[in-house]
Amino acid sequence: MMSINLNLIMAFLLALAGVLIYRSHLMSTLLCLEGMMLSLFILMALLISHFHMFSASMAPLILLVFSACEAGVGLALLVKTSSNYGNDYVQNLNLLQC
């Protein structure tokens, strides 16, 4: 169980490093954020089942719902910036004025 937790924490840290390194393109940032959310979901589900905390069994599902909402908003931003500017650079996001 300890090696699985270590692998999931390393996956989260690698996705976080991906967000920090590849932050020029929006698509790369969104993929890294999805990797972070997926590793958090699996880690949370494994820890809840390992420690038999079934009162908190809805927490991974709530995290998954927020992850889906984040993906939807991120893809909407990606479509908006790529249709307006023709690329997916993050630096174009502060040019969007609503």
UniProtKB/Swiss-Prot annotation:
Annotated Gene3D superfamilies: 1.10.287.3510
Residues spanning the membrane: 1-21, 28-48, 59-79
GO function terms (MF aspect): NADH dehydrogenase (ubiquinone) activity
Domain of life: Eukaryota
Main subcellular location: mitochondrion
GO biological process terms held by the UniProt record: ATP synthesis coupled electron transport
Location relative to the cell: Mitochondrion inner membrane
Catalyzed reactions per annotation: a ubiquinone + NADH + 5 H(+)(in) = a ubiquinol + NAD(+) + 4 H(+)(out)
Membrane topology qualifier: Multi-pass membrane protein
Enzyme class: translocase
EC numbers for this chain: 7.1.1.2
InterPro entries: NADH_UbQ_OxRdtase_chain4L/K, NUOK/Mnh_C1-like
Keywords linked to the UniProt accession: Electron transport, Membrane, Mitochondrion, Mitochondrion inner membrane, NAD, Respiratory chain, Translocase, Transmembrane, Transmembrane helix, Transport, Ubiquinone
Cellular component annotations (GO), alphabetically ordered: mitochondrial inner membrane; respiratory chain complex I
Pfam families: Oxidored_q2
Protein family according to the UniProt entry: Belongs to the complex I subunit 4L family.
Subunit structure: Core subunit of respiratory chain NADH dehydrogenase (Complex I) which is composed of 45 different subunits.
Record's function text: Core subunit of the mitochondrial membrane respiratory chain NADH dehydrogenase (Complex I) which catalyzes electron transfer from NADH through the respiratory chain, using ubiquinone as an electron acceptor. Part of the enzyme membrane arm which is embedded in the lipid bilayer and involved in proton translocation.
Entry-linked PANTHER family: NADH-UBIQUINONE OXIDOREDUCTASE CHAIN 4L (PTHR11434:SF0), NADH-UBIQUINONE OXIDOREDUCTASE SUBUNIT ND4L (PTHR11434)
Protein name: NADH-ubiquinone oxidoreductase chain 4L
Organism: Lagorchestes hirsutus (Rufous hare-wallaby)
Lineage, broadest ranks: Eukaryota, Metazoa, Chordata, Craniata, Vertebrata
Gene encoding the protein: MT-ND4L
